[in-house]
């Protein structure tokens, strides 16, 4: 293989010496192909020959050959040894000094290629190359030849950006060459010098950095000439963008000079001053704070700076502007002047304002007062690009005004956020008035910006544009009718119209329907498929507006029938056409489904034409899913559309879909069958339905509980609506259901659907589905032949006992209790039999019997069974922990059904049985939890609350932590029952001198907070601060539970703590720090082990911070928040894992702020990814490090998605380093692939 390669390379080298340029070209091209192969291996001699030949071809007379030779350098440097790379670099550097311009140019391109391809791994190649190039480039920069100087500066900038850390020893040499170039007479030289200098200062030591900054600031204080002022200000801005965090110490001096120079009568200088301000605001957020008012004033002055144009002629009434001729809107361009540079000043001011708004969320209210009116007034800006930047600045303001759902829905907290929102509402008429004429400008960009702003306005103030539709709709019409509108313009217009229709009640659009319908219909027939697709989506929404069916839709005398024919015929034409784009087909199907669902009663004669088309589309694989979704809309419609013509074909087809390996199709098919059975069961025979439901048994599996849940719901519906369809097939699906009941994964909504199914089945009174048969089948896997309720022989159930997961016992018990609810007469006999036989059974049988008794007792009064309580309590003494837990659960559950009998017993036992206290407290918790969820349960529980409360308080300081935790939960749940009386008692207990008592009391508050509205909420909001102020408690255990309670409040009901955040956050941040007083050494034989008692508190603090990301970030100083996240990146393994998650989330929630700290984040993530575990470490250490790497790389992946992150050199270099490290690259590729995998298709199930 190798000899073949050598021979092939030798042949290529020989052809490269040919006099025929075509031979040379083809040989060079073939060489490049060979070099790109991973398998190529060159010996030393071949390397030398190839390098020598490629370098020779750089001097070829033919330009195409030269270009190919340059391209060969990239793969070549990764295939040859270091000495050959040095030869290449030396040769290219020498050629850069050549007298031949073409050779100089091709050599500089070659050097850039080599630098771009050098690996960033830890070998010596890159440092050696940097060492060889740097001196020569520094010398070249000092040459008089401008072209050499420019190329050298370019290459040096590349070198510094990629390998800055290797060039630190040469900084003094480089600076010596660069600094004089800032005074060059050539602007191009000065600009490239600034770029190189900015990259250099990223890695420079403090002395070098401060030296350069001082040089620039001294130069600004005593400038040699006007050009130097511009250069130094540009340089400051550029340095700030690259290494801004280090400029903070010089901000005050810099801003003083900028404020002076910004007043000079020099437009270019003003522009540079504003750009520098933008960089300072972005990169030095804390240091720039005192100067924000000055920057704001500067921007407001210069955003209106237009000395060569008089706007007064445009300041008249714009209200009637929509009625004027189009020519009125071309005036602004006529005043453009090639010599007028003032637009650059205005643009710089607008961009600076956008950054200011984006990074200063805490000033939003002030911005609405001072900045918003000024921006609105500048919407009339004559220069298109400046106007666009002004719009984007206002969009940034709107984005910062968005309300979280929690705050928007919480009336108690609206006063906290109504400032910006109310100011925006006040200014809404001004915004619409300013935008109205712009929506008919000829400039596409301006119109698109109008729609962008209006759409963001909808996000900030949902439903607020209703009163202004008279001003907005004609603008939409203009863009859709304008023949000069581009496709993007039309798509943007339709997209905004869709958002508008979605975000407002239907009745507000009724006056505009005569204009909107023809507009949208015309767009549906647009030849460009993307416009047609978008138009069909809008038309579907328009159907819901023309004829709303929602129960809460306002009554209207709107004449809907007059538009039905037009909408239907338009959609039908699109539905019939087959040779169109897939998206158009799908949208046409969806639109027609909506039309029939909302207007089908007005289209009786057309249904015979339209419905068969759906049947045809069901047969086509690519339109199948869309058709099922559309038919589901129709079947669920309150109009009860007559589907008889197609039902006999649809149901068998849906049955075949259930066999397909297509999850979304299965889910939607099950949902459609369910809707058909609910609304049309009288329209077809049971045997037709059987063709579909016979396919259900394989779908009832714990491998996909969501599909299983839909299947169970459908069977329940069939059992209630058309039970005859189950005859002959119930054994198959029942077998699957019984296997599912034994699954450890069955819980929540899937378990509830299973219970409903059993109740529906027993009501059918079909053979084999009677109570005794079903109960026997459920008991058989546990009790075998001993569990027969009647004659087990007739039930046909297997008698062998199966080893089950403990969750399966709970599920089976609940199923038996659900069946018993339908046959109440057997409840007491069954419970009696189970309790009587308890002594004869093994542990697993006892667990199952106890759980079953408990679940039956939850629904029935079992107090007539005399031996029941004592038998259950005796099980508390069992050796098996699982038996004890089941007994505890059973005692609590049977107490729910007969509270007066069993609650006094539990309270008495807690008093006299200290060894069984933990189990009895769990029984009590079961009672409180079960009865406090319904009004009838609360009525039962309320009289007993005082006695329960007193008993619980006696055990707040018991020695066992587990018991204290249960006491805390019970106290919290009891407070919800009677908050007015019990919450003050908790507050009183908070003043206890006992740290244990305080811990239990603070912990109990967590259980008073739920994500649903509760009567206690108002009271809790007034008093929760007293409990959370326990974050200052001297005892670590109290602070930890206070953090947990704080976390619960932020997660479930942020409005409770929103006002307290300024006070609580400093205490929270304090708990994220490592505290030396909580670290101790423990001797374990000859070894000393360090124990950090503060770790659990720090974990609780970081968990609380993570929750704040989702719920309270609008009230948090993000930059301060980031400080503590970054500190956590260097903490213990558990903390690191949390902060990696937070980093990834922050990259999505506040990308602009994270971008400012990207360098620091990348450095810490790089340290984790490159960390090596010690050779003699245990396996667990390797696993931990692998998990850290995976989590760190997930954070890197999220950071890399931030807009403009690809301009951060540290990130770019790190990503390249990851790709060059096989181990990291494999993980990273998997993460990226995983992140773009679409989530499965979830649909909302209507179980009515």
From Swiss-Prot:
GO BP, sorted A to Z: negative regulation of protein neddylation; protein ubiquitination; regulation of protein stability; SCF complex assembly
Q: Which ranges form a coiled coil?
A: none
| Gene Ontology CC entries for this record | nucleus
| InterPro entries referenced in this protein's UniProt entry, alphabetically | ARM-like (IPR011989), ARM-type_fold (IPR016024), CAND1/CAND2 (IPR039852), TATA-bd_TIP120 (IPR013932)
For this protein, the record's SUPFAM superfamilies field holds: ARM repeat
Null allele outcome, as annotated, is: Lethality in the pupal stage. Accumulation of neddylated Cul3 and stabilization of the Cul3 adapter protein HIB. Enhances protein degradation of Cubitus interruptus (Ci), suggesting that Cul3-RING ligase activity is enhanced in the absence of Cand1.
**Keyword Oxidoreductase recorded:** no
Give residue ranges of the HEAT repeats: 44-82, 127-165, 168-206, 365-403, 425-463, 510-548, 604-642, 644-682, 861-900, 976-1014, 1054-1093
Q: Which UniProt keywords apply?
A: Repeat, Ubl conjugation pathway
Instruction: Describe its function.
Output: Key assembly factor of SCF (SKP1-CUL1-F-box protein) E3 ubiquitin ligase complexes that promotes the exchange of the substrate-recognition F-box subunit in SCF complexes, thereby playing a key role in the cellular repertoire of SCF complexes. Acts as a F-box protein exchange factor. Probably plays a similar role in other cullin-RING E3 ubiquitin ligase complexes.
The family this protein is said to belong to: Belongs to the CAND family.
Q: What is this protein called?
A: Cullin-associated NEDD8-dissociated protein 1
Native source organism of the sequence = Drosophila melanogaster
Organism lineage: Eukaryota, Metazoa, Ecdysozoa, Arthropoda, Hexapoda
Q: Which gene encodes it?
A: Cand1
